[in-house]
UniProtKB/Swiss-Prot annotation:
Membrane-spanning segments: 4-24, 61-81
Protein name (Swiss-Prot/TrEMBL): Uncharacterized protein YczI
Taxonomic path: Bacteria, Bacillati, Bacillota, Bacilli, Bacillales
Keyword Cytoplasm attached: no
The keyword Transmembrane helix belongs to this UniProt entry's keyword annotation: yes
Positions of disulphide bridges: none
Gene assigned in the entry: yczI
Location in the cell: Cell membrane
Membrane topology, record value: Multi-pass membrane protein
One Pfam short name: DUF3953
């Protein structure tokens, strides 16, 4: 089940990267949205690693996902200001 979500989020990230490459004037918003999906992929990967009893790698992925989400939140708020 996680694999389907990870693959769909990865496809969304690739599509957003291609859109950001074509529209250079709106990249700040697209990059923040792309970071949200990247964080979701990393979070799901962390949950999978925790299920495999690989707690160190799973915790690292979850912490990194939270960091990526906080960076995207900062990007959203800076774009609004």
């Amino acid at each position: 089940m996680f694999r389907i979500f990870k693959m769909s989020f990865a496809v969304i990230i690739i599509i957003l990267a291609l859109i950001a490459f074509n529209y250079t004037e709106h990249t700040s918003v697209i990059q923040s949205v792309m970071l949200v999906f990247l964080g979701a992929v990393m979070f799901m990967q962390g949950l999978e690693e925790r299920k495999k009893e690989n707690d160190g790698s799973g915790a690292f992925n979850i912490y990194t996902a939270v960091f990526v989400w906080s960076v995207s939140l900062i990007g959203f708020t800076l774009h609004i200001i």
